[in-house]
Amino acid sequence: MSDLSHIRNFSIIAHIDHGKSTLADRFIQMCGGLSDREMEAQVLDSMDLERERGITIKAHSVTLHYKAQDGKTYQLNFIDTPGHVDFTYEVSRSLAACEGALLVVDAGQGVEAQSVANCYTAIEQGLEVMPVLNKMDLPQAEPERVKEEIESIIGIDATDAVACSAKSGMGVLEVLERLVTAIPAPEGEIEAPLQALIIDSWFDNYLGVVSLVRVKNGRVKKGDKILVKSTGKVHQVDSVGVFTPKHTETVDLKAGEVGFIIAGIKDIHGAPVGDTLTLNNTPDVEVLPGFKRVKPQVYAGLFPVSSDDFEDFRDALQKLTLNDSSLQYEPESSEALGFGFRCGFLGMLHMEIIQERLEREYDLDLITTAPTVVFEIVQKNGEIIYVDNPSKLPDLASIQEMREPICRATILVPKDHLGNVITLCIEKRGVQRDMHFLSGQVQVVYDLPMNEVVLDFFDRLKSTSRGYASLDYSFDRFEPSNLVRLDVLINGEKVDALALIVHRDNAPYKGRQLVEKMKELIPRQMFDVAIQAAIGGQIIARSTVKALRKNVLAKCYGGDVSRKRKLLEKQKAGKKRMKQVGSVEIPQEAFLAVLKVDS
């Protein structure tokens, strides 16, 4: 099938839980990618974590052959993408490899913020967007209302949107038929020099680096010598092929196709995502526009529980960064926790997932410090610095102005829950920018401090709106704000890993809450442990974990008061001596207590 008119490349985009992966399952079933024995629900979500949480984290690609009603057999290359706001970069990467996108909308819930955001990304990249109404078998499906929403919120024509139910398989054939006609075929020259874009890479212990590529021009086959444009290194191709979802080797990959290339690259940084591959004998092929690097929004320190694991931890991070290009890290040391890494994540879910993947796939025990965002600091000498770690904050005397990141958040919420959502946004120091009333929902746009959004805003939003509100946010700008560093002292010593940067108005309240929380979590010692919260030199809250003590008077029956006093004084002196030399072990829960503090 060398003719490009038979190829269709498309992504499936949708909000969380609108049925992307189930629709992908139906496609695979109908086009015979797997036997019935191998078929399972969400067959593409191959990571244990994805299956447990029921979410897609990585974009997965599949090549299927579909015999359409016009008698032709089409090659469908499709990519199932994540729906969660933290993984938007996975979506934009997938879209770069496609000519079209299926916008899957739950006919009961209607359009949600994440589908809007992903849809705009697709339209910006010039893709043909085809709306599909899913879950039509549910009694609460309202196709007419949802079509209206698609037109009013996203602005694409939805009059003839295909209705289907991925679960029962109803209407899925119509989706495939419409797909073949609505989505354009790829453009490219098979005879031109090779030009291929790396969409994703991962590390296999046996094969080295496996890269998923979209071939724009030319062809690549086993034995070819390929050149990686950014590094200038040449590798020999060991095998090429496609996922049907099974790993299937083919003779070659041609223009317009999506598949994998294995070239025995051992160096983890040998094939960066977004890079261009070409053949060794045509080194002057121009570089394809890659993807814009995503900036991490949340930073946290990750430390191995035992310092012997440090090297393994570094290797694990390197391998994970290859697979997840938005993860950034740099070494850091903490007085309390020893050596570790400061890692940058796209959001809280991303951070949880990375920590779980490190603990599971690489068998590490980790301690995480409280996440913070990046602050912009203007110093008295006019220099601007960016701080992602509260303990690195310069002395307050040298700071002229502190600016915090503000993000533009778009929230879609049913009218009944609007009041609660607005109250929540005000509590989080939000400023309302816009409000549109749509058929059943309201779209509100707020400017919110990133610090408030990344920690627990999403969970609070879901609970205050009974799960109906949806959120999409993106970094907008830095804005001057009255911020202070809140330090936690344990027995008079600062614990650098527990420091926080908070708004001055919330600081005393936050300090009190944090201290109370820590009191519950730090186990009782043989001596009193004082927990204090301080801003600069001023202590704003304190509580004490009382000492455990033995009843030294148990052996005195009656007896002289001076005898009792002697024993008590002796105990007191011992406790005092202990307090001078004793150290307090802080459990992992205490570091995470910082997250649970309501502002």
Swiss-Prot record:
InterPro entries per the UniProt record, alphabetical: EF-4, EFG_III/V, EFG_V-like, EFTu-like_2, LepA_C_sf, LepA_CTD, LepA_IV, P-loop_NTPase
Gene Ontology CC terms: plasma membrane
Membrane spanning residue stretches: none
Pfam families assigned to the protein according to its UniProt record, in alphabetical order: EFG_C, GTP_EFTU, GTP_EFTU_D2, LepA_C
Residues the entry annotates as binding GTP: 17-22, 134-137
Membrane protein topology class: Peripheral membrane protein
Domain tr-type G: 5-187
Catalytic class of the enzyme: hydrolase
Gene Ontology BP annotations: positive regulation of translation
Assigned protein family: Belongs to the TRAFAC class translation factor GTPase superfamily. Classic translation factor GTPase family. LepA subfamily.
The protein, known as: Elongation factor 4
Taxonomic path: Bacteria, Pseudomonadati, Pseudomonadota, Gammaproteobacteria, Pseudomonadales
Gene name of the record: lepA
